């Protein structure tokens, strides 16, 4: 069964780390564009009639007055409110809260795993190249993509602590914790089933460090 997808070429903000994958057949977080309220760094609040989250770099996509899909500059954004959840700017991506304690908590941003995608292209010549290369231009067209041409996704988790976002990973987290919290986190890390990409594990860490 064929599906119509938007072909988008745009500059990708580099991200680090290696995470467990999931699969999607869409380039956006939502199946359709929908209303959102956007809060900007200049203090303005903008009501956007048609908005979405672009999974290539977890950024804001919106339809302008001419009916053209556009990508917003993430550096100008603070928060995006959809009807079901809010996204907050974390470095170069927009991330949603998984769990919170007051104003702190655990946040997640899903992005397309370009390394895995490009490797799949090399291994399977039947897959259509979506041309997700780096460029400063947005190029839109439609493609017929089959069921087998799904895109790999990886989650990036962050802890919000004292107003700052910290990547949820051992080397980033342990160095900022005091001795007792490091001991507790290391104890949790040694338990069977612990993973830095498992939300249940990260929620337990959140309760230790926050």
Q: Which positions does each model-derived feature cover?
A:
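Aromatic-patch recognition
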Residues: 47-168
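Bacterial Sec-dependent N-terminal signal peptides
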Residues: 1-25, 205
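A short, solvent-exposed beta-edge/loop patch
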Residues: 142-204, 210
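Glycine-rich, compositionally biased intrinsically disordered regions
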Residues: 34-51
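Short N-terminal segments immediately surrounding and downstream of signal-peptide cleavage
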Residues: 22-39
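General structural signal for secondary-structure boundaries
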Residues: 23-26, 42, 71-74, 169-172
